[in-house]
UniProtKB/Swiss-Prot annotation:
Organism whose genome encodes this protein: Homo sapiens (Human)
Protein name: Polyadenylate-binding protein-interacting protein 2B
Statement: the UniProt record of this protein carries the keyword Transmembrane helix: no
Gene Ontology annotations of biological process type: negative regulation of translation; negative regulation of translational initiation
Family membership noted in the UniProt record: Belongs to the PAIP2 family.
Region called Disordered, residue ranges: 1-30, 91-123
Polar residues composition-biased segments: 1-13
Disulfides per UniProt: none
Known role: Inhibits translation of capped and polyadenylated mRNAs by displacing PABPC1 from the poly(A) tail.
Oligomeric form and interacting partners: Interacts (via central acidic portion and C-terminus) with PABPC1 (via the second and third RRM domains and the C-terminus).
Chain positions with N-acetylmethionine modification: M1
Tissue expr: Expressed in brain, cervix, heart, liver, ovary, kidney, prostate and testis.
Pfam families: PAM2
Length: 123
């Protein structure tokens, strides 16, 4: 091709290859490929609301777990140190089998002729 042929070609005429690369005709909206950005603010607002909602739920669950943790009685945490030592001493105690059952019955203040107690039954 010589220079005279190139000069006769008008710049406004595009080949099919050029139209394929840009994705649209000159008759179409030149900003068509950017139309997705039209709703970008709505999308961002929606994502931000979802993140705030998730953060709120996380904080609620953490607060609920903290309250539940406070409700539980944990001796090592809730008892003073002296009480903890007393608790250890009580855990070390055991009932001895050295007492004779006759000895216990002779010192008892219970009525041996009383009916046997059955819960829920009226006498």
């Amino acid at each position: 091709m010589n220079g005279s042929n190139m000069a006769n070609t008008s710049p406004s005429v595009k080949s099919k290859e050029d139209q394929g690369l840009s994705g649209h005709d000159e008759k179409e909206n030149p900003f068509a490929e950017y139309m997705w950005m039209e709703n970008e603010e709505d999308f961002n607002r929606q994502v931000e609301e979802e993140l705030q909602e998730q953060d709120f739920l996380d904080r609620c669950f953490q607060e609920m777990l903290d309250e539940e943790d406070q409700d539980w009685f944990i001796p090592s945490r809730d008892l003073p140190q002296a009480m903890g030592q007393l608790q250890q001493q009580l855990n070390g105690l055991s009932v001895s089998e050295g007492h004779d059952s006759e000895d216990i019955l002779s010192k008892s203040n219970l009525n041996p002729d009383a009916k046997e107690f059955i819960p829920g039954e009226k006498y």
